[in-house]
Amino acid sequence: MTNSNRIKLTWISFLSYALTGALVIVTGMVMGNIADYFNLPVSSMSNTFTFLNAGILISIFLNAWLMEIVPLKTQLRFGFLLMVLAVAGLMFSHSLALFSAAMFILGVVSGITMSIGTFLVTQMYEGRQRGSRLLFTDSFFSMAGMIFPMIAAFLLARSIEWYWVYACIGLVYVAIFILTFGCEFPALGKHAPKTDAPVAKEKWGIGVLFLSIAALCYILGQLGFISWVPEYAKGLGMSLNDAGTLVSNFWMSYMVGMWAFSFILRFFDLQRILTVLAGLAAILMYVFNTGTPAHMAWSILALGFFSSAIYTTIITLGSQQTKVPSPKLVNFVLTCGTIGTMLTFVVTGPIVEHSGPQAALLTANGLYAVVFVMCFLLGFVSRHRQHNTLTSH
């Protein structure tokens, strides 16, 4: 593989995470405006975003097999066509059914692109370098989470319609589409070069189960938390702008944390540092949820920084449970994380309706505690140490 080709593939991976980050994180900012647009209460509107999350889940799950049938480049180019259709649907339809369909399509495109991005990184890099590369790739999720709420706040404050936020997000996919030209992708399945050596199938082990539960609880907890922070902050008397700043600060700190940990992780055992970070994140979220508005800015910055490496380290440890990284195993852990995404409003919507936004934040806190327990238990069964030893010889 040429260096310029590797750079293009790496940038496609970066932007695939940015696309998903933008679509998922901007929800909390535009939900109120979309609810007004369709004359619905916010708690009911939140349920329609389940279509976005369902699209992400289904596409990541199916793409574990689709990658071996449909070439990656073809998938990305077809995704561009779907993206244009979905954004056009949001702009020109006033029907809730069409809105839900467009959200589902956006989810499908996002899920396919993100699973391709993750696979490309695990395919191109090995060992601890894979972990730091995945972490840097995931930082683009946070970067989008920092930039797009600011764009959304800027547009909405000027009474520009909410769907222009999604048009801006569509520009990320335009960049991915352009990068596919003159770029060679790894061939999989029937398109892969034939080898005589039989491929040995490895058992995944119970560590994958612990990591999958951790991935689900972490994403459900994180998105359940960050989706309702704006409503919670407004309930404490903050303006929409200040609430948006809290969300942007979280993702800015998350992004800086990822850059820092992509260097720091090289010097630590991944399972041990993951357990420490999961415990710290649970404590810091509790401090935010029970603190005063004066301390919220600082506690959300600390939470963003120390929780930044958790999800990517879960995926990296998952890929290291077998000697040869398996696209199906990586996609399985990703799928569990995406189930967490899909359940975000299914779980938190009724909680907010009955008990208010703070109850949703405390539920998220409980989920972070489960992540800590899973990471601790992983220490007794993880295979990453023996596989790292084998690859280093």
Curated annotation (Swiss-Prot):
The UniProt entry, under InterPro entries, shows: MFS, MFS_dom, MFS_trans_sf, MFS_TsgA, MFS_TsgA-like
What sections of the sequence does the record tag as coiled-coil? none
Specify the protein's topology with respect to the membrane: Multi-pass membrane protein
As for subcellular location, the record says: Cell inner membrane
Q: Which Pfam families match?
A: MFS_1
What keywords were assigned to this record? Cell inner membrane, Cell membrane, Membrane, Transmembrane, Transmembrane helix
Q: Which residues cross the membrane?
A: 11-31, 51-71, 78-98, 101-121, 134-154, 162-182, 206-226, 245-265, 273-293, 297-317, 332-352, 361-381
According to the UniProt record, one GO cellular component term is: plasma membrane
**Entry's Gene Ontology molecular function annotations:** transmembrane transporter activity
Protein family (similarity comment): Belongs to the major facilitator superfamily. TsgA family.
| Name of the molecule in the record | Protein TsgA
* Species, as recorded: Escherichia coli (strain SMS-3-5 / SECEC)
